[in-house]
Amino acid sequence: MNKYEYAVASESVVLESLGFEFVRDLSPGEGLFIDSSGSIFLEQCSDKPELTPCIFEHVYFARPDSMMDDISVYKCRLRMGDRLAKKIIRTNPGYTIDVVIPIPDTSRQSAQALAETLGVKLREGFMKNRYIGRTFIMPGQKERKKSVRQKLSPVKLEFSGKNVLLVDDSIAVSYTHLRAHETS
């Protein structure tokens, strides 16, 4: 009987939080097999292995303190915000933005970098109800709309009389954006 424990996860932070050592990422199309005696086998299972990462992993699903495919999720999100800010400067040099507000939570790092690059204040304009889950993966449209209404509560002081740039991680289903617009 093997005396070792094994864990396999898509994010490094899971392994770290459970006290496991990160060994390596699996290659595209690679399978990992652990038999009943604890022996590990790696096998290429695809005829045409190709890395095709899901954009939502780094942008939305992954925790910012994770490494995925040897890329820091936190650093990736900071770079996205910086690049968006540079695009704003390039395409709209006379921009008038008083405040940058992230839609909680995963857009926070991008909003931080964007605000810093633009030289604009970063503010928390929404308080998130921690008991409402991810709204875009809820089963029906009615359920999603109801949950979005309950999910974000605006800090009206941060919106009143200001040109606000809202930063979100992605637009999968735009109910959150509609709610954010209604409240501001």
Protein language model features and the residues they cover:
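N-terminal segments that mediate ammonia production and transfer
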Residues: 1-107, 115-149, 154-155
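Generic non-transmembrane alpha-helix signal with a bias for helix starts/N-cap capping motifs
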Residues: 107-108, 177
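Conserved structured catalytic cores and adjacent interaction surfaces
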Residues: 154-162, 170
